[in-house]
Design a protein with these regions (language model features):
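Catalytic beta-strand/loop cores that center a nucleophilic Ser/Cys/Thr
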Residues: 118-195
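Single, functionally critical "micro-switch" positions that shape active/binding sites
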Residues: 77, 140, 203
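N-terminal beta1-alpha1 cap of cysteine-dependent amidohydrolase-like domains
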Residues: 1-97, 103-111, 118, 149-158, ...
Length: 243
């Protein structure tokens, strides 16, 4: 689905296994976007995304740093978001340490439903200049509660405009469960790094790129694209214009 979304936006996509990348780190030089899709890497053993995060942190840290310095993009969806936080790539205020995590849902169960999101900041390259107040995406996770290590980190994320998405209800108001399915602090659903080049999001934009993927499309009528498509379109447009 992630591959399809990027291809629909005009990108040429290769699916590269982490072991291949670890064996040939120079592969990163051939690409402009690194996407970590949703799923259950390593069976979510230890904690969701932690093993992949360690592989990235201890084997690819310099390569990822170069990737970002070259103005390239990284997207983490669900398990990919969990991986980016545990690798210290998000929120990346103090680049030497992990500052946030995605932990077990307050409900202590797997949550699978559609949620409303509001776009809080256009700091992220993936959201630049979008004038869309609300988007509707599916979620599917057991460890989707976003928390920071302390209040200072949270305040910095907020003041830096790194909070890109928040959970809201159908009236556009921030609300608790079930609209905020994991119990994330401040209803945070997605954040970016200080450069805006790295985006992590718990809901699944790749599962709503076609209008017919909306659960009420027969009643609401068809739009040109599904709500999640803007993330992939903006990323590809950025690459075409800047890299």
């Amino acid at each position: 689905e992630t591959r399809y979304a990027f291809e629909k936006a005009g990108a040429k996509v290769d699916a590269v296994h982490i072991n291949i990348l670890l064996a040939n780190k120079k592969l990163l030089e051939d690409y402009q976007i690194l996407a970590l899709p949703g799923g259950f890497t390593y069976g979510d053993d230890i904690s969701a995304g932690k093993i992949l995060a360690n592989q990235i942190k201890y084997n690819l840290e310099e390569d990822i740093t170069t990737f970002i310095h070259e103005k390239k993009l990284i997207l983490g969806i669900c398990n990919g978001f969990q991986t980016l936080t545990k690798a210290g790539l998000l929120p990346a205020i103090d680049k030497q340490h992990q500052e946030a995590t995605l932990t077990f849902n307050d409900s202590n169960k797997f949550e699978d439903r559609w949620v409303y999101l509001k776009i809080c900041s256009n700091k992220s390259v993936f959201i630049k200049e979008e004038n869309v107040p609300t988007i509707y995406l599916p979620i599917a996770h057991g460890e989707g509660k976003f928390v920071t290590k302390d209040e200072t980190t949270l305040n910095k994320i907020m003041s830096n405009q790194q909070v890109v998405f928040k959970y809201i209800n159908e009236c556009g108001e921030e609300a608790g469960y079930p609209w905020n399915p994991g119990g994330s602090i401040q209803n945070i659903a997605g954040i970016c790094d200080p450069t805006g080049q790295i985006l992590g999001i718990m809901p699944h934009p790749e599962r709503h790129v076609e209008p017919t993927q909306h659960p009420r499309w027969t009643r609401n009528g068809l739009k040109e694209f599904g709500d999640g498509f803007l993330i992939f379109r903006n990323a590809v447009d950025y690459v075409k214009s800047n890299l």
